Amino acid sequence: MCVLSIDIETFSDVDLTKCGVYAYSDSPAFEILLFAYAFDDEPTAVIDIACGETLPHRVLAALEDASIIKTAFNAQFERTCISRYLGRHLSSEGWQCTAVQSALLALPLSLDAVGEVLDIQRKKLKEGVDLVKFFSMPCKATKANGGRTRNFPEHDPEKWERFKTYCIRDVDAEREIRRKLQKYPIPDSEMELYRMDQEINDRGILVDQELVSSAVLCDNQYREMVTARAYELTGLSNPNSPAQIKSWLADRGVETESLDKKSVKSLMAETDGEVLEVLKLRLLMAKTSVKKYEAIERSVCSDGRVHGLLQFYGANRTGRWAGRLVQVQNLPQNHIVDLELARELVKNCLLYTSDA
């Protein structure tokens, strides 16, 4: 069976770590810069797409041919990015992920770490981190760089050649790892689960973007309101500071080692007046959390969906899925009777009404 090993280097103005590969590749600024590949045991070649080279017909045909196995370390990244580049969805059928194969054996989840554990000869090049930062991410505009916000190959041809070598080496490292693990193939049952996982992530979840943005806005307004009242009562420069609040309380005869929820509630039972109100405000300032909404805002794609919420074998010692981006598996159960009313209140930023 023919195998095509792939590694790509890309550019996007979206943060891959914070937003995931789907939003990363969905950006209008997204590009594939380099495409390194090797069929079976053939030497690895690299296509310099950034400098105008195009993918050979043989590679394009293989990408569409389910009988040819496409492999990569973290194949979801390559498949998603190449789908975006080609302008059509590539099914996970015919793709295998060497990272998943490594995780099945409780090996690390990164190419360089697996290479170290298996002591492969052609390890991932350490300088790659700096090269990726230089070419694959926006740069800060300075007088020295002429005010540009991105580095192109012509800005450092020598680095660009090293970047191409780095891309080739990633294919070589992935192939060597795969050969070392060939006695431990991914079982068919696990491959079926992997393809289901990829389908789930490709499909994503539709989100109510109006509700999300309104929830974040409400949180900002609510925090400002609560903090303003805390400033008014305490006169502190930062009423969110535990040290300042402890000192303020001590001046009023209230001593405490901690300001966690349990301690504050205990103090509330013993105080009144301004001290009681400040303690209530302390709880309110720590109460609301819209981190999931903020993660949705960062990660939502142009189709109104958030993709890539699960990582197959993310917990590689147990084989469990791991949540990514929004951590949907940690959403609390919802028992609000008038949920639709609550949603409308949030959408309209009716803080006082919804708080009541």
Predicted features by range, described:
Residues M1-T10, V14, S27, L34-A36, ...:
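Conserved "right-hand" nucleotidyltransferase catalytic core of DNA-directed polymerases
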Residues F30-Y37, D41-Q182, V337:
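Active-site-proximal helix-loop-helix substrate-binding element of RNase H-like nuclease domains
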